[in-house]
Amino acid sequence: MDVGELLSFKPEQTPKRPSDFDRPDDDEDDDGGSPGPKARPQQRAQKVRRTEQDTHVRSKPVLPAKEPQISEQERLDILKFVETEEPDGEVLDESGLKKMLLLFEKRVLKNQEMRIKFPDNAEKFMESEIELNDAIQELHAVATVPDLYPLLVELNGVASLLELLSHQNADISVAVVDLLQELTDVDILHESLEGAETLIEALRNQQAAGLLVQNLERLQETVKEEADGVHNTLAIFENLIEIRPEIAKEVAEQGLLQWILKRLRAKLPFDANKLYCSEILSILVQDSNENRIMLGTIDGIDVLLQQLAAYKRHDPNSAEEQEFMENLFNTLCSALMARENRDKFLKGEGLQLMNLMLREKKLSRNGSLKVLDHAMSGPDGRDNCNKFVDILGLRTIFPLFMKTPKRNKNRLLGTDEHEEHIVSIIASMLHNCKGSQRQRLLAKFTENDFEKIERLMELHRKYLDKVEAMDREIDQQMRTEDDDEQDDDAIYVKRLSGGLFTLQLVDYIILEVSCTDVVKQRVLKILNLHHGSMKTIRHVMREYAGNLGDASDSDWREQEQAHILQLIDRF
């Protein structure tokens, strides 16, 4: 009986403890069967002894066949023992780590010797392999003391572990991966800055990423233990990138990006590892332009489009698969921030796929809208904008402009976010389309008695109200805080997220479509009807021009500012 069972057992409340051999004629009806929960409660209260024949405890805890009752003095003795006894596993110190690593190295060498001596006789080296695995398991104790990581590195423990990733027995490499995953756990690394820095640098210097990817190549995910090894390997990469974001570029260059694409293409059922691959892929490209370009050069855009094509007419089968789909959309959006990938997206018929998804009204509609926004924005989106008009994309986008779909549990895109993407796409087309494509676009705003102008002005009023409410909130905060604490950039960002960004896009569209007198007169009529002002639109657009872009592309910024100011003067 262990200590927990002894302490949790509650003896029957009787005047005195019965003798073990009291009432020897106790009945033995239970021939090996456990009594039910309602079996003879009165007798249970009286019969607390047990004989050799009656080994079944008549109480709720199912205990071993030993004396179930203890006296109060015995209980106190047990408590005293538990409180004073030293724990089995003492806190690891430097001396303990040195002994542990020495034993580990001995077992590595012994296993190598036995494998060389008996290469074709597994029975001969199997015992040494089991001992090696046990030594690896013992090293998990190091993860509880991250301050010892520098000593672990100094004694070449990390190098020895990484060498075992190429061990002939995949079980050994999986055990090493499991250990490395625990050693690099983010919460543990945060406990010791020096330990984290030392361990991460050692892993980088030893080209750990490349070794881990090589091990991934040989793991068979049809074997549960090896599938777990794949999952833990991905966790190691996630841990390292979270601590050192610049590592994302290194691990991609050492083969992780290519392996993930290969894993996504594999004809395997959807599982946790495929989901995790999509998460790591999204992380790799979200902040690294080098990784975005690399993704395009190894046909990553085509792989993403092929994977997403499965959801053009069918929704994901589970919440996990929906998360997988969203990760792919996010990855594609990040990839399209690289100029080189816009053309690959166009040639891969990404526009046609996104347009089809918008028409099908499945869960993929949300992601496709964001992808189109990224593909068509800025000067690099010119070809995609013109092509979108050519494939009759206007027939798809304007119904969504006229009426925002209602949000429900399956349509996770909020109203404001949906409208932001729609007006951003239309603004990009007005900016980038030339010739016949632009004429077809402008003609849309005069159809059906200028209904789209009416909708445009409705959005102008909606987001103007939002911005004015945000400005009042900011003014109130400024009155209660010191002026020194105010950050103009932070305030502007807050206003953008509060509706100013969408308002700027809406007002930009108003200026672009007001190039003809008939449209301009309709805009003025609606403004007067709702007590609006052209001055408001001009003010919004001047502020937009003043904060346009960044200093990295000064020529583009100057051209855009000149174009917007020209539109303002004409309006």
Question: How would you name each of these model-derived features?
Answer:
Residues 1-148, 181, 185, 198-206, ...:
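N-terminal "cap/leader" segments of large eukaryotic alpha-helical scaffolds
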Residues 147, 197-198, 245, 289:
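Leucine-rich repeat
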Residues 124-138, 169-192, 205-242, 252-253, ...:
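Alpha-helical solenoid repeats of the armadillo/HEAT superfamily
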Residues 118-125, 145, 151-152, 157-162, ...:
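HEAT/HEAT-like alpha-solenoid repeats
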Residues 141-148, 158, 163, 167-170, ...:
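Short helix-loop boundary/capping segments at the starts of domains
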Residues 515-539:
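C-terminal/domain-terminus segments
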